[in-house]
Amino acid sequence: MSDLFSFNKEKKNKLVDNNYSAKDIEVLEGLEPVRKRPGMYIGGTDSNAMHHLVSEVLDNAMDEAVAGFASIITITMHHDHSITIFDNGRGIPIDNHPKFPDKSALEVILTTLHSGGKFSNNVYHTAGGLHGVGISVVNALSKHLEIKVYKQGKLYSQSYSKGEKLTDLICEEASKRLRGTSINFTPDPEIFSEKLHFNPKKIYELARSKAYLYRGVTIEWACEVEVQSDIPKKALISFPNGLKDYLSSKITLDNLVIPGIFAGNIESKSDRIKLEWAICWQNNDSSAFVQSYCNTVPTPQGGTHEQGLKSAILRGLKAYGEMIGNKKAANLTIEDILETASVVLSIFIAEPSFQGQTKEKLVSNGVSKPVENIIKDHFDHFLSSDKALATNLLEHVISIAEFRISKKNEKNISRKNATQKLRLPGKLADCTRTSPEGTELFIVEGDSAGGSAKQARNRETQAVLPLWGKVLNVASSTLEKIVNNQAIQDLEIALACGSLKNYKKENLRYEKIIIMTDADVDGAHIASLLMTFFFLRMPKLVEEGHLYLAKPPLYRLTQSNKTYYAGDEEEKAKLMDKLLKASKAKIEVGRFKGLGEMMPAQLKETTMHPEKRSLLKVTLADFQNVDKIVDDLMGKKPEKRFQFIYEQALVKMDKIISELDI
C-alpha cells in the first residue's frame, strides 16, 4: 500500500520519459462506446438499466402512435426471455440514406448514435427516446436483435448481434395490409448478468402506463413466460378516459376527502403543449404519490412540468382561502397540499430537454408557466363550482399544515393532551392508565390496521399509534431526513423519552413498545425499518428490554366450524397435516392480506390479548457493535448485505448436506 504513495527516482524517470502522443488516444467507432461504457447510456447494467431497453423500443412505438401513424402496439414476452415489440405505424425507412449511400436508413438508425427521425420537427412534433441514441443502444447491448419492417406489400428484415450486422437487408413479399415495425431482441449476458431476465409484471405495468398516457392506442399484450402473479397471459390494454382511469385504478375511491377526481385534458396551440392531469385527495397518505411524464416517458425526478402543477394547486387553494376569509390558508405549503394527494401529470411538447440520458427529469424552459396557467384556471373553476367540496379540501390541507406547525413548536407533551396536540393521522389512541407500568404501545402502519387495533385493544393499558407517512431507513439517511421524517417525529413525540444522548428512561410513557405489522414480506420490511430506528436512535430502550414484535397470523383455517390460525406457510402445513389426521372434514384456508382485513375480535384473540398472544422480545447479543451490525445489514453498501446473505446461505447449505442420507 505504501508503494502507492512513494515517489522514487525510477518512477520520476518514467514520468519524464513517458511520451503522451496521438497513438495513446483511443478512438471508439460505431457502437463501441456503448458496449464499453453502457452506464453512460442506460444508467448502469442492473435490472433497471436492462428494462430501459424495453422502454426505449416501446417509446419509439408510442411516438408513432402519438404522431397519429399507429393505433396498435403489440408486446410479446417469449419463452427464451427475448421480447418483441411491434407497431402498425409507417415502418422505419429502408431506402438508402443520403449521407451514407451504401447503407439503408434502417441500418444507419440501428448502428449510428444520434440518428433517427426525432431530430426533425417535420417528422415528429413530440417524441420520447434516449436523446436519439435509443434504438442503436438497444442494438449494441443485445445478444441478438432482429428487425422487420412491413411496407407496401414487402417485408424487409435484418439481424444483428452486439451491434454488428449479421445479414444484409432481406426483402420478401408480404401482405399489402401489413405495415409497421417489429423488433425482437435479447439483452447481452456479457453486459448484464446471465441471471437477469425481463420482469413480466414490470413490463406489463409499463405497457399499461403507456396506454393510459395516450388514449388513441391499443396495446396487445402476450406473455409466454410462466409467472406466479396476477399478470395475464393475454390482454388488450386501452383506456378511453386516460389518466382519470389510471388514477381510479390506483386509489380507494371510498377513502377520498372530496368526491371525484380533479382531471383535465387540454391542448394549447399557442403554447405548443398538450397537457393532461388527474388529482385526488385521500384521508391518509397510504396511496399518496406524484407521477409525471413527458411525451409518454416517465420523469421520476419531476422537473419543470411538475413545478407548474404544484404552483397552480398552491396558488389556487391559497386564493380560495383568501376569498372566503380563511387566514390559515396563507400558511399552506405545497408539501401540506400533496401530503395525501395522488397526482398524475402528462405533457406532450416539441423538443423536450431532459437531465441525463435516461430522461428522469424534465428541464425544458418555457414549460412551467403554461402548465401553471392552464391548471390554475381549471382548478379555480373546480373549487368555485362546489363551495362545500372546496371548503372540505381546504380544511383538510389546513389541518395538515397546523399539524406540521405544531410539531415544530411543541417540545413537551403530556399524556393528558397528547391526542389533541399531536393531531396524528388516525389519532394516537392512548390508554387511560397514567403510569407506564403495565402499559403497551402498539405501532401499526396506516389507518386501516390502526382502526382494527383500536377496537381490539384494552383501553386501560393498550395504546395504538398508526404511523402516517413512509417509514425511513435510518441507517442510510442523513440527519436532516431523519429529523424531518413524519413517521419518526410521530413516534418520538408519542414515546417522549428522547433519542440518542437525550434518551431518558424515566420519561418513557409505556412499558412495552410492540411493533405490529402484517405477517407477510412487506410487513417484515416495515418491521425491520422500525427496528433499525430503535437500534440507532434509541439503543438503550432496546437494551432495557422494552421493544417487542407482535406475531399476527398469516392464515386462517376452518374445519367443522372450528377456527385455527397459522403464522406462516410451514406452520400452516403442519397444522393442516395435524387436522387431516384427526378428521377428514374439509379445511377452508384463508390468507389475511393485512391487519386491517382482520376483524377486531380476531386481532385481539391472536395478537393483542396478553394471555393468548405470542411476542418476540427484540434484543442484540452484542450491543457494543450495534452500529456496525445495523450498518452492514441496512446501510448504503449492498456488498455487505450480500456477504451476510452468502455466509448464512453457506451455513444453511452445510446443514442441509449434513442431513442428507447418502
UniProtKB/Swiss-Prot annotation:
<dbReference type="InterPro" id="IPR014721">
    <property type="entry name" value="Ribsml_uS5_D2-typ_fold_subgr"/>
</dbReference>
<dbReference type="InterPro" id="IPR018522">
    <property type="entry name" value="TopoIIA_CS"/>
</dbReference>
<comment type="function">
    <text>Topoisomerase IV is essential for chromosome segregation. It relaxes supercoiled DNA. Performs the decatenation events required during the replication of a circular DNA molecule.</text>
</comment>
<dbReference type="Pfam" id="PF00986">
    <property type="entry name" value="DNA_gyraseB_C"/>
</dbReference>
<dbReference type="GO" id="GO:0007059">
    <property type="term" value="P:chromosome segregation"/>
</dbReference>
<dbReference type="InterPro" id="IPR036890">
    <property type="entry name" value="HATPase_C_sf"/>
</dbReference>
<dbReference type="InterPro" id="IPR001241">
    <property type="entry name" value="Topo_IIA"/>
</dbReference>
<dbReference type="InterPro" id="IPR006171">
    <property type="entry name" value="TOPRIM_dom"/>
</dbReference>
<feature type="binding site">
    <location>
        <position position="518"/>
    </location>
    <ligand>
        <name>Mg(2+) 2</name>
    </ligand>
</feature>
<feature type="binding site">
    <location>
        <position position="359"/>
    </location>
    <ligand>
        <name>ATP</name>
    </ligand>
</feature>
<dbReference type="InterPro" id="IPR005737">
    <property type="entry name" value="TopoIV_B_Gneg"/>
</dbReference>
<dbReference type="GO" id="GO:0003918">
    <property type="term" value="F:DNA topoisomerase type II (double strand cut, ATP-hydrolyzing) activity"/>
</dbReference>
<keyword id="KW-0413">Isomerase</keyword>
<keyword id="KW-0067">ATP-binding</keyword>
<feature type="domain" description="Toprim">
    <location>
        <begin position="439"/>
        <end position="553"/>
    </location>
</feature>
<dbReference type="GO" id="GO:0046872">
    <property type="term" value="F:metal ion binding"/>
</dbReference>
<dbReference type="InterPro" id="IPR020568">
    <property type="entry name" value="Ribosomal_Su5_D2-typ_SF"/>
</dbReference>
<feature type="binding site">
    <location>
        <position position="518"/>
    </location>
    <ligand>
        <name>Mg(2+) 1</name>
    </ligand>
</feature>
<dbReference type="InterPro" id="IPR000565">
    <property type="entry name" value="Topo_IIA_B"/>
</dbReference>
<keyword id="KW-0799">Topoisomerase</keyword>
<dbReference type="InterPro" id="IPR013760">
    <property type="entry name" value="Topo_IIA-like_dom_sf"/>
</dbReference>
<dbReference type="GO" id="GO:0003677">
    <property type="term" value="F:DNA binding"/>
</dbReference>
<feature type="site" description="Interaction with DNA">
    <location>
        <position position="470"/>
    </location>
</feature>
<feature type="binding site">
    <location>
        <begin position="129"/>
        <end position="135"/>
    </location>
    <ligand>
        <name>ATP</name>
    </ligand>
</feature>
<dbReference type="InterPro" id="IPR002288">
    <property type="entry name" value="DNA_gyrase_B_C"/>
</dbReference>
<feature type="site" description="Interaction with DNA">
    <location>
        <position position="473"/>
    </location>
</feature>
<keyword id="KW-0238">DNA-binding</keyword>
<comment type="subunit">
    <text>Heterotetramer composed of ParC and ParE.</text>
</comment>
<keyword id="KW-0479">Metal-binding</keyword>
<dbReference type="GO" id="GO:0006265">
    <property type="term" value="P:DNA topological change"/>
</dbReference>
<comment type="similarity">
    <text>Belongs to the type II topoisomerase family. ParE type 1 subfamily.</text>
</comment>
<dbReference type="Pfam" id="PF00204">
    <property type="entry name" value="DNA_gyraseB"/>
</dbReference>
<dbReference type="InterPro" id="IPR013759">
    <property type="entry name" value="Topo_IIA_B_C"/>
</dbReference>
<feature type="binding site">
    <location>
        <position position="20"/>
    </location>
    <ligand>
        <name>ATP</name>
    </ligand>
</feature>
<feature type="binding site">
    <location>
        <position position="520"/>
    </location>
    <ligand>
        <name>Mg(2+) 2</name>
    </ligand>
</feature>
<feature type="binding site">
    <location>
        <position position="60"/>
    </location>
    <ligand>
        <name>ATP</name>
    </ligand>
</feature>
<dbReference type="Pfam" id="PF01751">
    <property type="entry name" value="Toprim"/>
</dbReference>
<protein>
    <recommendedName>
        <fullName>DNA topoisomerase 4 subunit B</fullName>
        <ecNumber>5.6.2.2</ecNumber>
    </recommendedName>
</protein>
<dbReference type="InterPro" id="IPR013506">
    <property type="entry name" value="Topo_IIA_bsu_dom2"/>
</dbReference>
<dbReference type="GO" id="GO:0005524">
    <property type="term" value="F:ATP binding"/>
</dbReference>
<keyword id="KW-0460">Magnesium</keyword>
<feature type="binding site">
    <location>
        <position position="87"/>
    </location>
    <ligand>
        <name>ATP</name>
    </ligand>
</feature>
